[in-house]
Curated annotation (Swiss-Prot):
The gene is msbA. Pfam families: ABC_membrane (PF00664), ABC_tran (PF00005). This is ATP-dependent lipid A-core flippase. It catalyses: ATP + H2O + lipid A-core oligosaccharideSide 1 = ADP + phosphate + lipid A-core oligosaccharideSide 2. Residues 347-585 form the ABC transporter domain. Its EC number is 7.5.2.6. It comes from Cupriavidus pinatubonensis (strain JMP 134 / LMG 1197) (Cupriavidus necator (strain JMP 134)). InterPro entries: AAA+_ATPase, ABC1_TM_dom, ABC1_TM_sf, ABC_transporter-like_ATP-bd, ABC_transporter-like_CS, ABC_transpr_lipidA, P-loop_NTPase, Type_1_exporter.
């Protein structure tokens, strides 16, 4: 049993979403009205054709039109021309509105995505965001445009044809208005069952495809564990269910046309009988009856569209709600009135704590670290000890849940977010490059090619040991490097990311496992580039390979989100604590 309160709440929510969509149409109101007028012309033309046929049969053959051979053809041609122009105009104008709204919504979604906080990307996969911004919004507008056309054009068509029917024969129209809804109800029952069977069949087809995908993808496990019989049994069950659903669909689909034809014949028989009775009393003519039947048949299609509108309308509004949910995502807090031209780089972590969610264990707890300007501090510790979480707090990808972080004596929350991030360069093992030129990747953040300082790009490439590599590319610094730098080797991609950090020339540098995925030769080149980059910068280094951070000014060892120990490489080895244990394990392995 349905819940009336819940249904009312859902309906109210749909109205709210609909009103918000209408808000996007307000700037296009003039074009919108013009499109409605064009659709009204198309709808009115539906009622003209039965009238022309009526007059042709009653007056055209030996009647008052006999000497005017051009009359009916001229009317038909004129109606077709006007209808065609109006149809094109309505389609073009609605497409114009739809594409303008599409552009506006896409830009709003992309803007909100770019300015969303880091936890937004933890909740949403890249695939779901791509689907929403590129495909879902397009589908929503396509569905809602189609629904709008149905609501306006088909409603006006129904009105125009009903006016003609009442004008021609009001008695017969009243009888038809009783018969047609009954036929429509019976047909909707058949179609509803067919749609339900189609949905279930599609779900089963997807399940069967998944069984095939699993068996094909896991063929080694299937063969090694003798799972052929089990997989055959799984697939046989699915195939049998598919066969049964296909037969039920064949029955429902097969009944559809003959039942429709029978009901239409029954309705037509009733109408013909009544029309013949009327004809005997000179209440109708051949032309009037033919025009009436034609108008009645023309009425069926728009009525069917209007009765079927609820499903696509609901689907469109539901999808629109998901789009608005993305548009309404909160943006990163931009608070902070402190302005920094260029920071010295003095970083202080005061009793910093962080949790990823309410009720979860602390990822960081009571972190107290002072990093003087220009010092290199390495963060080491077992996986899950909080190293990456700690460095993610510096550019405010997340905000501490306890304590605070200071930059040059200012709490980072008091510094304008853009200015804070201008002070930080980041190089990670997960290199992110863009499908653009070498120069555009090095100078990433420049709004146009004119803003790129090419001399500075060349210096950055030289410092990253990439000058010779770039010279050998087809178009030098103007060579497109492909999706995520696929045209470059792993070491070259990493050095290009370092060149980007060098170009930015920020006073604070964060290195997150920057050499962990490289071979020995690439690591040597990248390490040399990193050493050049670290000179004069406050640097936080995360490293699993302890050999790469032995020369750090200080090493901080984290364990379970707390500082376990800190000191130089030699001091920590002498202390024989966690760091010394990790060091022994690594070098024993090597």
């Amino acid at each position: 049993m349905s819940n009336p309160a819940k249904s009312e709440q859902s309906a109210g929510h749909d109205v709210k979403v609909g009103k918000r969509l209408m808000g996007y149409l307000r700037p296009e109101l003039r074009i919108f009205i013009a499109a409605i007028l064009a659709m009204a012309v198309v709808a009115a033309s539906e009622g003209v054709i039965p009238k022309v046929v009526n007059d042709l049969l009653d007056k055209g053959f030996g009647g008052e039109y006999a000497g005017k051979l051009w009359h009916v053809p001229a009317i038909l041609t004129g109606v077709a021309l006007i209808r065609g122009v109006a149809q094109f105009a309505s389609g073009y104008l609605l497409s114009l509105i739809s594409n303008r709204v599409l552009l506006k919504m896409r830009m709003q979604m992309f803007d909100r995505m770019l300015h969303a906080p880091a936890h937004f990307y933890h909740r949403n996969t890249a695939a779901s965001l791509i689907n929403a911004v590129i495909f879902e919004v397009n589908q929503v507008l396509s569905i809602l445009t189609s629904v709008f056309i149905t609501l306006v054009r088909d409603s006006l068509t129904v009105v125009a044809l009903l006016i003609y029917l009442f004008y021609t024969n009001w008695r017969l129209t009243l009888i038809v208005s009783v018969i047609l809804p009954v036929i429509g109800y019976l047909m909707s029952k058949i179609n509803r069952r067919l749609r339900r069977l189609n949905r279930d069949h599609q779900t089963l087809t997807n399940s069967a495809a998944y069984v095939v995908e699993e068996a094909a993808g896991g063929y080694k496990v299937v063969k090694l564990h003798g799972g052929e019989a089990y997989e055959m049994n799984r697939f046989r069950n699915m195939a049998d269910r598919l066969k049964n659903y296909s037969m039920r669909m064949a029955v429902a689909g097969g009944l559809n046309q003959p039942v429709t034809a029978f009901l239409a014949a029954l309705a037509l028989s009733v109408i013909i009988t009544i029309a013949m009775i009327q004809a005997q009393g000179n209440q109708t003519t051949i032309g009037g009856f033919t025009g009436f039947v034609m108008a009645m048949l023309l009425l069926i299609s728009p009525l069917k569209h209007l009765t079927d509108i609820n499903q696509p309308l609901t689907r469109g509004l539901t999808a629109a709600e998901l789009i608005f949910r993305l548009i309404d995502e909160p943006v990163e807090p931009q608070d902070g009135g402190v302005r920094l031209e260029r920071a010295k780089g003095d970083l202080v972590f005061e009793r910093v704590g962080f949790r990823y969610g309410e009720g979860t264990r602390p990822a960081l707890e009571g972190i107290d670290i002072r990093v003087p300007a220009g010092e290199v501090v390495a963060l080491v510790g077992p996986s899950g000890s909080g190293k990456t979480t700690l460095v993610n707090l510096v550019p405010r990808f997340f905000d501490p849940t306890d304590g605070r972080i200071l930059l040059d004596g200012h709490a980072i929350g008091d510094i304008a977010l853009r200015e804070l991030r201008n002070q930080i360069a980041f190089v990670s093992q997960d290199v992110v490059l863009f499908n653009d030129t070498v120069a555009a990747n090095v100078a990433y953040g420049a709004r146009s090619e004119e803003e790129i300082d090419m001399a500075r790009v060349e210096r950055a490439l030289q410092a990253a040991y990439l000058t010779e590599v770039v010279k050998n590319l087809p178009e030098g610094v103007n060579t497109n490097i492909g999706d995520n730098g696929m045209k470059l080797s792993g070491g070259q991609r990493q050095r290009l990311a370092i060149a980007r950090a060098i170009y930015k020339d920020a006073p604070i540098l964060i290195l997150d496992e920057a050499t962990s995925a490289l071979d020995s030769e690439s690591e040597r080149q990248v390490q040399a580039a990193l050493e050049a980059l670290m000179v004069g910068r406050t640097t936080l280094v995360i490293a699993h390979r302890l050999s790469t951070i032995e020369n750090a000014d200080r090493i901080v060892v984290l364990d379970h989100g707390r500082v376990a120990e800190h000191g130089t490489h030699e001091e920590l080895l002498a202390a024989n604590g966690l760091y010394a244990g990790l060091h022994r394990i690594q070098f024993a392995t090597h």
